[in-house]
């Protein structure tokens, strides 16, 4: 992980169009409820309190004409460590946590030791390293040179471990049983 990547996220933040979900120009809409917004912004507060470097702060976003909306802007943390709650917990909001490692083996180990297995991203110029990482990590989705592993909302979830969704949960036998009535 290098500092240029973290710096480039600032450009993404400045160009990200946040607005109502009904606006076709919006790239990111509001969070679901006031409680959801409070939870996500509380997670951001906790990350700051635990010592993560807050590079982009999305808290307190107010959009003109939508002052009562549940908007939180994109948030970027750098220098996150595995003992921090923003690393341990799944944050269902626009929060990206960067964990720096020395090599690809350390990255795979870090991902595999995590209790959740929803998705991870790797940034590299080495195609072989990206393929090896994707093969070796025990997660449902891998993004290569993208900040999130699934950039399309209609893509089915494929999380593993405690992430619930995946081929052993709603996208597998449990989902078939849920939508099937035996006669």
Enumerate the predicted regions with their spans.
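Single conserved hydrophobic/aromatic residue that forms the stacking wall/gate
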Residues: 1-12
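Hydrophobic packing residues within well-ordered alpha-helices of enzyme cores
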Residues: 8-9, 40, 130-133
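Conserved C-terminal structural/oligomerization subdomain of aldehyde/semialdehyde dehydrogenase
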Residues: 17-18, 28, 44, 67-183
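Short linear capping/connector segments at secondary-structure termini
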Residues: 23-29
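Short beta-strand to alpha-helix junction loop
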Residues: 31-41
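Conserved dinucleotide-binding and phosphotransfer motif residues
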Residues: 50
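Conserved PLP cofactor-binding pocket of PLP-dependent enzymes
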Residues: 53-70, 149
């Amino acid at each position: 992980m290098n500092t240029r990547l973290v710096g480039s996220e600032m450009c993404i933040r400045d160009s990200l169009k946040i607005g109502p979900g009904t606006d076709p120009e919006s790239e990111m809409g509001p969070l679901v409820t006031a409680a959801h917004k409070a939870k996500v912004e509380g997670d951001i507060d906790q990350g700051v309190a635990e010592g993560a470097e807050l590079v982009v702060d999305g808290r307190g976003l107010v959009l003109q004409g939508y002052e009562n909306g549940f908007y939180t802007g994109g948030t970027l943390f750098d220098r996150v460590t595995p003992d921090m709650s923003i690393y341990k917990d799944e944050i269902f909001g626009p929060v990206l946590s960067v964990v720096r490692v020395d090599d690809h083996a350390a990255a795979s180990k870090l991902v595999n030791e995590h209790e959740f297995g929803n998705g991870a991203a790797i940034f590299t110029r080495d195609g072989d390293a990206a393929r090896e990482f994707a093969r070796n990590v025990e997660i449902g989705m891998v993004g290569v040179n993208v900040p999130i592993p699934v950039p399309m909302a209609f893509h089915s979830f494929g999380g593993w471990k405690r992430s619930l969704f995946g081929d052993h949960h709603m996208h597998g036998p449990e989902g078939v049983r849920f939508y099937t009535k035996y006669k």
